[in-house]
Amino acid sequence: MKHLVQRFIRYVTFDTQSNPKKKCCPSTSGQMKFAEHLKQELLDLGLSQVELDEHGYLMAKLPSNVAYPVPAIGFIAHMDTAPDASGKNVKPQIIEDYHGGDIALGIGDEVLSPVQYPELHALHGHNLITTDGTTLLGADNKAGIAEILSAIEMLIENPSIPHGDICIGFTPDEEIGRGADLFNVERFGAEWAYTIDGGPQGELEYENFNASSADVIFHGVSVHPGTAKDKMVNAMTLASQFHCRMPADETPETTEGYQGFYHLKSAEMGVARSELGYILRDFERDGIARRKAFMQSLADDMNTQLKHGSVEIRFTDSYYNMKEKVEPFPHVIELAKQAMEVCDVEPIIKPIRGGTDGARLSFMGLPCPNIFTGGYNFHGIHEFASIEQMEKSVQVIVKIAELTAKKYA
């Protein structure tokens, strides 16, 4: 625990922003530099089977300290930060004993305000780590990495705490949906695992969205504007017409809880060709299928009305709801709940309105729910973390390892 904050502050100085436009893995060189740093740290801690592969996947093991067989469990976090905001030259600031009110972020005009982020009201007395208002912080997911390694350090320094084999995995490119692409589950060696990639204290998640993307391509007819009457088909107009027919009350900014959505994420516009990039999210498989069918029906309807030009849609599934793969192993959830309760943390079981590496890993044979980090407002300049909640995450990780060993004693 003594090195938790120092670790985190050091980790966020690495620029590990992933790049969805790059097809290589990892998608950015900074992730590999960070992985090499972590590899040395794992070796310095004395862990075994420390391996960093050419794709930036880093794995290691803390061997069991008990004489009887205990299932190997794992803890996983990702090394990249989101492309949504800069992760370069992160300058974290520590706010000691927060007593309310606005927090100035750096020397500019940006503030972290409880008016905009009311969760701050519950954090009076906490020590907070914030940005300087120019970058994201990187608590997603470097807080998770720092917490895992601090928990491992605690287990090493306290051999009286029983534990089985503890497998550690740090992945690249999670933020661009590729974190599990080349993850070797067999090499990892755990029977089940936990991603340490959640938000506020108490979060325990084993449900997530089913996720698909839809690239909607509009083919127009380009003609000189001066002679375009009855000839031009403006693909940008088609794109506008299509989007105007999408449900306005089923977007990220209008939904919560178990509600799904359509999200227009990108647009490339031109007269001859335009493209809209959507992501589709729903907690039910039938729901995601209905969303695809609805969008396809819009395209089909437009195509029947067009004499020239056309609309096509390409759907790609990204990940599925891990619930169906985790629920058959209730002990995985119960151990995490029990660990939280012993550590005086109230479990908050709720769906992830997103995805984690664990969602895909669960479908690869590794049940893998998600546990809190103590971070807030991920992917933007108002991201921050509570040091006290980060410390609780460390305690919960240690307690999961201990309770697992005691369960099989």
From Swiss-Prot:
Enzyme class: hydrolase
Gene transcribed to yield this protein: pepT
Biological processes, Gene Ontology terms: peptide catabolic process; proteolysis
Listed EC numbers: 3.4.11.4
Entry annotation: catalytic residues: 80, 174 (proton acceptor)
Catalytic activity: Release of the N-terminal residue from a tripeptide
Cofactor binding: number and manner: Binds 2 Zn(2+) ions per subunit.
NCBIfam families: peptidase-T, PRK05469.1, PRK13381.1
Cofactor: Zn(2+)
Name the UniProt record assigns to this protein: Peptidase T
Gene Ontology MF terms in the entry: metallopeptidase activity; tripeptide aminopeptidase activity; zinc ion binding
Highest taxon in the source lineage: Bacteria
Residues that, per the record, bind Zn(2+) 2: 140, 175, 379
Compartment(s): Cytoplasm
Organism: Vibrio vulnificus (strain YJ016)
